[in-house]
């Protein structure tokens, strides 16, 4: 420890490096050895675990391995552990020869290797099979013990009498007996199926293998016994799932307790040594505790194990919070459940933990601690606590005494009157003479000279024969001296008194209750004890013990007692009889028989599978036993050198001393992992196989001795993928087919109940009813039953019961009926039952339902709503409709009846589209100007064409729109998923005679070419296929617009208005695939509303299937595809010649085209179909792709997609495409998430329309019930005052006074655990209601200046568009002028300076990124360089010089002050924003949000200062949204530092943090001098210019105050690892991080003191702004500092310095009148003067109240603006506001009137108000939030006494 402290003191690297050199030298050899022995690259999360096992791996390896940790454990087992155990020549079994050779090089005692092929995979590991058993007395079995039964190990020892020790490695999770959940899931996982445990090492599925599920029983036995044969089992070591066991021969040693003395002494301190000891083993698991079982419930143990640290933290949290809600424990658990360290905890365990914590919150220990109290008080407390127990104990005893009187009568002494005397005269005397000893009957004994016992007569009663013990004792004592007693004065008679006197005596009386009463009392007492036990709570001690046992359980330990195992018989170790061998065999392959290596070993059922070329090492599957039938069958075909016939084996050895109740650790069953040495027998059952066996024909035709037999056995083909498409029934549930109330096949209703029905009304599918009615309740939406009941006079209940006799229950109770009500299908069934026909009058016209062969008729009206509704009777109309229909009616009827491949067109009705003249005029205007389209730009002057040019035609259309009204045209919309077949049915429709007069409009030439090819028309008809521009110039009866959403907005309206002959429009498109965006920055087409929302009501059906995409893509979207090809989703490094390339930009597309590849942009590929896999190019623009473009790219090809480019763009990070990442990782693409506002409104259909059913429902669906996420809904609004979910509310202690903490009950559950919610220790300062009296000054004299006159000519006339910039071909919008009001000058006053409005300027943040952010080159943390350390030290020394501090002196940490800072920080966070704002930002405390990730957004502001007035485009200020954890943890650190800075700061240094304008004025008047010039400085990109030296400076500042080290490390980690949605950032300053202002101010002050010899010169600093009173000399070391700085200075020598928007000088400070004048102009034109006037007035009064001296502060150029502002306030302010310009002190009532209804107040205006008014104003929700609260600053000043 002392050496470590010395190292920490050596800060300079020149001193530290030599000190560390010996340490480095001592570690070189160990690191080199570790890298050579364990060269594998181990995951960093597993490295600490391996080191804790004692494995010396450094983690610096570079070789990759699929399960590197297992490989490391295996290497340690072989080369270290086993090598140490192999002290004599030994044999090794089940190991690859190459690995054995390396092992033999480590230790030469490893002499021979024996391998046995018992599994097909063994042929890849073992080149040969050993025919005999090992010969050495020590054997090492490598990873095979889990496949062997103890009876087989016993057989091995019996076959090899010289075998003494068997070292075996066992790979089995010790927790396998608990559940299938691993305690170390990163190291291994496993599952148990029946009797098989499937083990997966480190997620490597190819290296997984199977083993018996009872293999873990090897860890539960300590010996194996068979008759007189004993084997001891010892666990030598465990490394997680790998265990080293030693099985050795011999009788186990006797228990030491048998050798101890037989009669130990009671006081023996070593008494436990003489008791039998248990053989207990334990295994390492994560630190966990076991939750108690729920009352009367059984929960699995694995689901009750939770991390101890989380449990303790949650226990403390639930009792520390003031108000606990039901959701708070769950939110606390969520914070920890996502941590990697807790991945072993099951979801049920997390659920049980939060439930356990929630339900046990009210429990508290019933204890008291009374120390300083009297014994009487302690006794009273004891009686109060234990009176029930004492009473319950005393009552039976007292009741028993009543019975004791019957058996042991006790005399009771009673007083008796013997004589009464008065005036010395005896009035009464008892007959018997009085004697003092009469009570003892001594006179009788003296006269008789016998004892009292002999004087008792035989006839005396029993109670007289038993004198009392006291009486007997007195007789024995007094009898020897009785003669002397008579002579004493005691027996002399005394002289009687004159006064009345009574003489009393004591007489013993015997008393006993009747035995009946005694029994009653005894029974009552016993009953009271019983009732006390049943109804009274446990005793205090029991409550205390139960509370701590229930709520503070101990750590869970995975341990058990090992027991001996007795086996009845042995089982053969090998499936064949081994030969006898005395010498190790030769391992060379030349000595092997040709056929032996592959055919001499039988094939057991497969236990493991390995598809990789590299077989597993530690996890490899060793040989496993096989079934009896297989072994016997294969043994009959063995070809061995010995010709001795195989004889039946001897009978197994039986054990007669097996206890009948012994635990069955290894069950004797015919499992696939065991075998028996018996001859072939018929098994009782077929064991479970992990892979299909070979066919019978193959076995019969294969010679077992064939050398190729092994390869045949090892060849198993994988199952082929299904070639048939996924049926639609697999997408949706089919309750009808599984309905138990139905019978028979699914058929149309008209076939099951044949009658004459109107067409397509009885074609719905159903089944025959098989069961009687179940009396289902009527649906809520039963308007159809009411309408039918009103017409037929049959009750609704009877109608409903009738439906239950003909339709199955699944068609009467489902989601459709619950949400939409009954439909016309049910009406058809009722019409059949009651023999009537119904006419439905709907928007589609009259429709008939029911059989036509009936004479009964009813009328029902259907209204579409919403909601839809059935009502009885016929709809009444005001007039008959016109007999003449629309010209397009015949076309629409033909479309409704048209079929393609037996399917109808997917639409319901044609919708009348009223054209919009404004939309059409917008588009034609942009076409005319060349902003959209190219027709107006075509040069036709050189051609021979006559007539108007295209531009002239467009102009004519423009003129035509000016004089012609709009019209209404029928529109039919076909919409569906990509590749659903929207185009093909329309192409077939257009080939019919009725639709021959058509034309097609396409967005691209590629799509037009596809139409031409598909229609196959004559060349003269090619004019019918057009691009979207040329189509407008042509005319036809029918217009088909393909990909309508890729057309400009307003195109539908323009096409209809431009063609008077047009009768019908058919539009095709998918609203999910995006819409048109103009490439011209001057186009105004984007100002029109989106066509996706405008055309959405025309979508009757959305086809949710595809004929194009392959199955792999269909699974992503969860959609049915008719394309049977599986397809691919992969990646390529270079494009293929035949594959189309899809790019993000036109430039990339042109590049690939020039390189010889077929390429187009993703957007332009919409509508195209590719046969080859589409190659998607990934580049920097991929992350900006919209969801629509991502959908287009993934659905273009019939074969799949391949990504080309950096994999980071599909890695699921901030810089990748979310949809591409889901596709690349085979994750489901949830459409509701990518299209939240559009997809839920689409009415999906999942299969083509085979019938055009006129089905009507009783309600209108709000969204299709198909493919809807159940969680897709808006969260309910919960009032902020909601308290019904409170579980507990802890009261405030009486001595604490009123509660000063703010409410936290409204905080999001994920944020509440981050609050300490500590009560402040300091008393809150009283709220001041006084106003600072102004100093008496002479009123300033203003030159006359009319505000309106100056404002009229202030703004020069200019074109605002010239001040905008282009970003990615899109213009910025910082100078909006269109439709903006103006009254002061010729243009809106808002054009004075740039306005940052992120909501109206999409380019604001993207265009500002390069200027405001600095990015790291990679995701790696920012590296602190040596220059950063040196510069940081220099700045720290300069900062200490500024504060007159010693750099080497540290300040002790003050915990009490830091606790106050925590409370203050939480107060600031809760009071700076409204409760609604905090709740709306609940995502800031999301546990899934990494604390190193910040969200960058643009600050909305209209900044007006000298630098922005009349300026051009300006980059916005970026704000960083950090996790609440960062703000609440590091915020107190900054406040803690600020308190010490306020104490140490010299008076000549001014920091503007938390200061009011009046304080600024006072300081200037006190410190600034009249010397000129003054040095004002500002920096360019100050935040971005701070690099690693700022982190070093901040860390040194915190170390000086001894801030806890973990907080310093957190700060450094955040600064060096910060990342955003745009990429990783350097350690630049972020506006929004804790202490931004303080750190910037300190950095600025440190730079100033590094540059100048300041001395006592007045200095003003505020962030990056600074002011020095007069020029100063430069320090000698400034050049060395300057060369390391990255700052860019903007020094200014001026006589009128500007600081924080105020002109300052010895006279005080005054607000910049030029900026204030501009703000007033903007407020007037924005019509916001009433909201802002008060703020501007209070800022103006700061300088106005200086009097005549204010003119010394202003430049001459600003005098007119100061006068104009004064003129403005005098003319525009009401009288009570003008009083603020007076020198007199404003009264509180006046200020209350002024601020009665504020809506907008600046920070400076708030500073000038009293505290009472500030608190009243901040309580109003409409006021803005301030990052710096005056109350917080005032509270900080109250904490200064801690450091004084």
Swiss-Prot record:
Residues 631-641 have a biased composition (Polar residues). Residues 725-736 have a biased composition (Low complexity). Residues 571-739, 860-888 are annotated as: Disordered. The active site is at 783 (for protease activity), 869 (for protease activity). A motif (GPP flap) lies at residues 865-867. Residues 728-879 form the OTU domain. PROSITE patterns: ALPHAVIRUS_MT, PEPTIDASE_C21, PSRV_HELICASE, RDRP_SSRNA_POS. Residues 1572-1678 form the RdRp catalytic domain. This is Non-structural replication polyprotein.
């Amino acid at each position: 420890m002392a050496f470590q402290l010395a190292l920490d003191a050596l800060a300079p690297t020149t001193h530290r490096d030599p000190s560390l050199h010996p340490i480095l030298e001592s570690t070189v050899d160990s690191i080199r050895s570790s890298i050579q022995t364990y060269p594998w690259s181990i995951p960093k999360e597993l490295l600490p675990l391996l080191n804790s096992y004692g494995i010396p791996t450094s983690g610096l390896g570079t070789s990759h391995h699929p399960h590197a940790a297992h490989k490391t454990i295996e290497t340690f087992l072989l080369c270290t552990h086993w090598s140490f155990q192999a002290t004599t020549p030994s044999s090794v079994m089940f190991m690859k020869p190459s690995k054995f050779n390396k092992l033999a090089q480590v230790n030469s005692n490893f002499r021979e290797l024996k391998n046995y092929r018992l599994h097909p995979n063994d042929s890849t590991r073992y080149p040969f099979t050993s025919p005999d058993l090992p010969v050495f007395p020590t054997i090492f079995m490598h990873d095979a013990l889990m496949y062997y039964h103890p009876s087989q190990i016993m057989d091995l020892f019996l076959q090899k009498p010289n075998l003494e020790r068997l070292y075996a490695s066992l790979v089995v999770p010790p927790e396998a007996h608990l559940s299938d959940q691993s305690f170390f899931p990163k190291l291994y996982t496993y599952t148990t199926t029946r009797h098989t445990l499937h083990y997966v090492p480190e997620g490597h599925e190819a290296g997984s293998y199977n083993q018996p599920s009872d293999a873990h029983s090897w860890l539960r036995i300590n010996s194996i016994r068979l008759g007189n044969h004993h084997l001891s089992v010892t666990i030598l070591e465990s490394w997680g799932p790998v265990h080293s066991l030693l099985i050795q021969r011999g009788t186990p040693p006797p228990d030491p307790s048998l050798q101890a003395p037989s009669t130990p002494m009671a006081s023996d301190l070593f008494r436990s040594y003489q008791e039998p000891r248990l053989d207990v083993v334990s295994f390492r698991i994560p630190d966990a505790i076991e939750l108690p079982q729920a009352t009367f419930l059984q929960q699995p143990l694995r689901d009750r194990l939770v991390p101890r640290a989380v449990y303790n933290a949650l226990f403390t949290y639930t009792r520390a919070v003031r108000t606990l809600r039901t959701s708070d424990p769950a939110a606390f658990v969520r914070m920890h459940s996502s941590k990697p360290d807790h991945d072993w905890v099951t979801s049920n365990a997390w659920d049980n933990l939060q439930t356990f914590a929630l339900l046990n919150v009210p429990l508290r220990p019933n204890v008291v601690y009374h120390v300083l109290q009297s014994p009487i008080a302690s006794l009273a407390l004891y009686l109060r606590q234990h009176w029930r127990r004492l009473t319950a104990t005393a009552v039976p005893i007292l009741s028993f005494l009543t019975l004791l009187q019957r058996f042991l009568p006790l005399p009771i002494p009673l007083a008796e009157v013997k004589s009464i005397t008065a005036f010395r005269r005896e009035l009464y005397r008892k007959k018997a003479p009085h004697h003092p000893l009469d009570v003892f009957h001594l006179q009788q004994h003296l006269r008789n000279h016998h004892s009292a016992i002999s004087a008792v007569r035989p006839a005396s009663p029993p109670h007289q024969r038993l004198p009392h013990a006291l009486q007997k004792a007195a007789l024995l004592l007094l009898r020897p001296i009785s003669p002397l007693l008579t002579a004493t004065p005691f027996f002399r008679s005394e002289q009687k008194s004159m006064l009345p006197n009574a003489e009393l005596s004591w007489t013993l009386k015997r008393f006993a209750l009747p035995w009946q009463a005694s029994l009653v009392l005894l029974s009552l007492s016993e009953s009271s004890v019983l009732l006390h036990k049943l109804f009274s709570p446990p005793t205090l001690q029991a409550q205390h013990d139960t509370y701590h046992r229930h709520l503070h359980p101990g750590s869970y330990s995975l341990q058990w007692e090992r027991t001996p195992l007795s086996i009845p018989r042995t089982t053969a170790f090998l499936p064949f009889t081994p030969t006898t061998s005395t010498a190790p065999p030769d391992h060379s392959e030349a000595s092997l028989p040709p056929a032996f290596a592959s055919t001499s070993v039988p094939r057991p059922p497969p236990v493991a599978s390995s598809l990789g070329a590299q077989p597993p090492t530690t996890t490899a599957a060793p040989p496993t036993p096989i079934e009896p039938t297989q072994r016997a069958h294969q043994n009959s075909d063995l070809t061995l050198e010995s010709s001795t016939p195989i004889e039946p084996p001897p009978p197994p050895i039986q054990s007669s001393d097996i206890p009948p109740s012994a635990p069955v650790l290894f069950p004797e069953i015919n499992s696939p992992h065991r075998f028996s040495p018996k001859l072939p027998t018929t098994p009782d059952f077929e064991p479970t196989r992990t892979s299909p066996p070979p066919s019978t024909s193959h076995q019969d035709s294969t010679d077992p001795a064939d050398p190729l037999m092994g390869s045949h056995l090892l060849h198993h083909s994988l199952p082929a993928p299904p070639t048939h498409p996924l049926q639609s029934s697999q997408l949706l549930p089919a309750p009808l087919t599984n309905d138990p109330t139905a019978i028979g096949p699914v058929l149309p209703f008209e076939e099951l109940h044949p009658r004459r029905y109107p067409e397509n009304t009885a074609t719905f599918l159903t089944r025959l009813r098989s069961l009687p009615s179940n009396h289902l309740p009527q649906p809520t939406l039963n308007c159809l039953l009411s309408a039918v009941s009103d017409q037929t006079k049959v009750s609704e209940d009877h109608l409903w019961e009738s439906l239950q006799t003909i339709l199955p229950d699944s068609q009467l109770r489902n989601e459709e009926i619950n949400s939409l009500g009954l439909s016309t299908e049910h009406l058809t069934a009722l019409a059949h039952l009651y023999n009537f026909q119904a006419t439905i009058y709907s928007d589609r016209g009259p429709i008939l339902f029911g059989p036509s062969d009936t004479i009964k008729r009813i009328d029902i009206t259907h209204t579409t709503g919403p909601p839809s509704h059935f009502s009885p009777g016929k709809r009444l109309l005001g007039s008959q409709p016109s007999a003449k229909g629309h010209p397009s009616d015949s076309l629409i009827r033909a479309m409704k009846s048209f079929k393609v491949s037996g399917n109808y067109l997917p639409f319901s009705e044609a919708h009348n589209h009223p054209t919009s003249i404004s939309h059409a005029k917008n588009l034609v205007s942009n076409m005319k100007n060349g902003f959209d389209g190219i027709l107006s730009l075509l040069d036709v002057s050189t051609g021979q064409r006559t007539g108007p040019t295209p531009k002239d035609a467009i102009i004519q259309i423009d003129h035509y729109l000016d004089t012609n009204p709009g019209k209404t045209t029928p529109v039919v919309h076909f919409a569906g998923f990509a590749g659903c077949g929207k185009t093909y049915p329309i192409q077939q429709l257009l080939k019919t005679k009725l639709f021959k007069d058509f034309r097609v409009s396409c967005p691209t030439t590629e799509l037009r070419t596809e139409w031409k090819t598909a229609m196959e028309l004559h060349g003269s008809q090619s004019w019918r296929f057009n691009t979207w521009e040329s189509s407008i110039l042509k005319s036809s009866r029918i217009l088909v617009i393909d990909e309508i959403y890729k057309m400009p907005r307003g195109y539908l309206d323009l096409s209809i208005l431009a063609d008077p002959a047009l009768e019908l429009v058919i539009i095709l498109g998918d609203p999910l695939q995006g819409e048109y965006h103009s490439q011209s920055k001057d186009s105004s087409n984007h100002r029109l509303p989106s066509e996706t929302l405008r055309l959405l009501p025309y979508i009757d059906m959305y086809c949710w299937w595809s004929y194009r995409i392959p199955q792999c893509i269909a699974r992503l979207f969860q959609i049915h595809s008719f394309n049977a090809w599986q397809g691919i989703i992969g990646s390529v490094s270079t494009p293929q010649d035949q594959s189309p390339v899809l790019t993000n930009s036109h430039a990339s597309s042109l590049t690939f085209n020039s390189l010889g590849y077929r390429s187009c942009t993703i957007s332009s590929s919409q509508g195209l179909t590719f046969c080859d896999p589409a190659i998607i190019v990934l580049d920097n623009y991929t992350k900006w792709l919209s969801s629509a473009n991502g959908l287009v790219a993934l659905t273009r090809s019939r074969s799949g997609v391949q990504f080309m480019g950096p994999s980071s763009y599909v890695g699921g990070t901030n810089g990748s495409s979310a949809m591409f990442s889901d596709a690349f990782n085979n994750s489901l693409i949830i459409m509701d998430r990518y299209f939240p506002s559009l997809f839920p409104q689409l009415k999906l259909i999942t299969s083509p329309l085979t019938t055009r059913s006129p089905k009507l429902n009783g309600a209108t669906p709000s969204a299709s019930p198909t493919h809807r996420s159940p969680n897709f809904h808006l969260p309910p609004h919960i009032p902020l005052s909601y308290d019904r979910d409170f579980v507990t509310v802890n009261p405030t202690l009486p001595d604490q006074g009123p509660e000063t903490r703010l409410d936290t009950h409204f905080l999001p559950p994920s944020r509440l655990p981050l609050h300490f919610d500590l009560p402040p220790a300091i008393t809150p300062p009283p709220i001041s209601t006084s106003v600072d009296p102004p100093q008496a000054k002479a009123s300033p004299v203003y030159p006359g200046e009319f505000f309106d006159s100056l404002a009229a000519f202030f703004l020069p006339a200019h074109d605002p568009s010239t001040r905008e910039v282009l970003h990615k071909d899109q213009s910025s919008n910082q100078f909006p002028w269109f439709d903006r009001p103006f009254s002061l000058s010729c243009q809106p006053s808002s054009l004075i300076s740039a306005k940052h409005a992120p909501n109206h300027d999409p380019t604001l943040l993207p265009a500002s990124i390069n200027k405001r952010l600095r990015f790291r080159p990679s995701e790696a943390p920012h590296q602190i360089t040596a220059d950063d350390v040196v510069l940081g030290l220099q700045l720290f020394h300069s900062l200490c010089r500024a504060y007159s501090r010693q750099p080497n002196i540290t300040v002790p940490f003050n915990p009490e002050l830091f606790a106050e800072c925590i409370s203050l920080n939480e107060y600031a966070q809760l009071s700076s924003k409204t409760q609604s704002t905090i709740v709306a930002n609940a995502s800031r405390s999301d546990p899934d949000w990494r604390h190193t990730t910040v969200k960058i957004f643009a600050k909305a502001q209209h900044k007006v200062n000298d630098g922005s007035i009349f300026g051009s485009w300006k980059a916005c200020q970026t704000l960083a949204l950090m996790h609440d954890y960062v703000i609440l943890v590091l915020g107190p650190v900054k406040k803690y530092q600020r308190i010490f800075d306020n104490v140490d700061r010299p008076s000549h240094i001014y920091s503007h943090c938390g200061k009011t304008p009046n304080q600024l004025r006072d300081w200037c008047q006190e410190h600034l001098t009249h010397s000129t010039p003054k040095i004002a400085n500002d920096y360019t990109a100050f935040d971005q210019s701070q690099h690693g030296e700022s982190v070093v400076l901040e860390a040194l500042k915190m170390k000086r105050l001894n801030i806890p080290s973990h907080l310093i490390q957190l700060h450094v980690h955040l600064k060096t690892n910060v990342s955003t949605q745009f990429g990783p950032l350097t350690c630049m300053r972020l506006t929004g991080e804790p202490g931004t202002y303080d750190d910037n101010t300190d950095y600025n002050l440190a730079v100033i003191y590094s540059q100048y010899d300041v001395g006592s010169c007045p200095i003003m600093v505020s962030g990056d702004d600074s002011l020095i009173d007069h020029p100063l000399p430069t320090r000698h070391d400034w050049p060395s500092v300057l060369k390391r700085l990255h700052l860019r200075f903007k020094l200014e020598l001026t006589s009128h310095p500007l600081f924080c928007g105020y002109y300052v000088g010895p006279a005080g400070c005054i607000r910049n009148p030029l900026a204030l004048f501009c703000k007033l102009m903007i407020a007037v034109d924005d019509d916001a003067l009433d909201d802002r006037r008060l703020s501007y007035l209070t800022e103006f009064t700061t300088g106005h109240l200086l009097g005549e001296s204010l003119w010394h502060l202003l430049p001459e150029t600003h005098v007119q603006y100061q006068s104009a502002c004064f003129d403005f306030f005098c003319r525009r302010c009401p009288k009570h506001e003008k009083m603020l310009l007076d020198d007199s002190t404003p009264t509180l009532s006046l200020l209350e009137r002024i601020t009665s209804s504020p809506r907008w107040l600046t920070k400076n205006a708030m500073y000038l108000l009293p505290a009472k008014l500030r608190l009243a104003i901040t309580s109003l929700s409409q006021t803005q939030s301030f990052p710096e609260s005056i109350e917080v600053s005032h509270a900080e000043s109250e904490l200064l006494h801690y450091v004084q």
